[in-house]
Curated annotation (Swiss-Prot):
The keyword Endoplasmic reticulum does not apply. NCBIfam families: uL30_euk (TIGR01310). Belongs to the universal ribosomal protein uL30 family. The gene is RPL7A. The keyword Ribonucleoprotein applies. Component of the large ribosomal subunit (LSU). Mature yeast ribosomes consist of a small (40S) and a large (60S) subunit. The 40S small subunit contains 1 molecule of ribosomal RNA (18S rRNA) and 33 different proteins (encoded by 57 genes). The large 60S subunit contains 3 rRNA molecules (25S, 5.8S and 5S rRNA) and 46 different proteins (encoded by 81 genes). Present with 101000 molecules/cell in log phase SD medium. Keywords: Cytoplasm, Ribonucleoprotein, Ribosomal protein. This is Large ribosomal subunit protein uL30A. Transmembrane segments: none annotated. One of its GO terms (cellular component) is cytoplasm. CDD domains: Ribosomal_L7_archeal_euk.
């Protein structure tokens, strides 16, 4: 007797085809994501190489300009700085309302907190108002990079989130072309077109007390008078290094 042919119900056939289609879609989506991630990594690596070349070229140009000025018997005058890093060095006691509001505006709500500030006529006026309560100056590429890598946190839904993955940065700043931590650093260093968005994404930096203390007999005197507050220009890098 011939074996009976077992017929698969039509509903079961449809289910099997649907499952097969779903599996194929999942595989296709996975392959597409893998290809997109590979392309993205290549873009990030290419950008990083371009950034490094840009930084090195700028540094060489400054060194050469200083040599040329010296050879000509004159002085090298740097271009006007576009960025300062500001550190709050005084607590809440005895700060008048107006400077206190400016500190809040610049997100310097705690002692030893620090933020980047774009240099404009308006921000220079704000810095004058809070000068007795902050130290600030012109951060180097190395200082900015170390700050972001070591102390960098993003503000996501009002939460402080560590920048542990480029995906976090892309999810929040990708619409501005900022895909990685080095894109973020470049936008800050160059005070690029999306500096405001990049800077606002960064949570104010929480720094430590300077290693070895402030090293001055009177902290609340101006830096040029042997104290700690005010504009210390390039010397801000030494301070940040001791607090990072």
């Amino acid at each position: 007797m011939a074996a009976e042919k077992i017929l698969t119900p039509e509903s079961q056939l449809k289910k099997s085809k649907a499952q097969q289609k779903t599996a194929e879609q999942v595989a296709a989506e996975r392959a597409a994501r893998k290809a997109a991630n590979k392309e993205k990594r290549a873009i990030i690596l290419e950008r990083n190489a371009a950034y490094q070349k840009e930084y090195e070229t700028a540094e060489r140009n400054i060194i050469q300009a200083k040599r040329d000025a010296k050879a000509a018997g004159s002085y090298y005058v740097e271009a006007q700085h576009k960025l300062v890093f500001v550190v709050r060095i005084k607590g809440i006691n005895k700060i008048p309302p107006k400077p206190r509001k400016v500190l809040q505006l610049l997100r310097l709500t705690r002692i030893n907190s620090g933020t980047f500030v774009k240099v404009t006529k308006a921000t220079l006026e704000l810095l004058k108002l809070i000068e007795p309560y902050v130290a600030y100056g012109y951060p180097s590429y190395s200082t900015i990079r170390q700050l972001v890598y070591k102390r960098g946190f993003g503000k996501i839904n009002k939460q402080r989130v560590p920048l542990s993955d480029n995906a976090i940065i892309e999810a929040n700043l990708g619409k501005y072309g900022i895909l990685s931590i080095d894109d973020l650093i470049h936008e800050i260093i160059t005070v690029g077109p999306h500096f405001k968005q990049a800077n606002n994404f960064l949570w104010p930096f929480k720094l430590s007390n300077p290693s070895g203390g402030w090293g001055v007999p009177r902290k609340f005197k101006h830096f040029i008078q042997g104290g700690s507050f005010g504009n210390r220009e390039e010397f801000i890098n030494k301070l940040v290094k001791s607090m990072n």
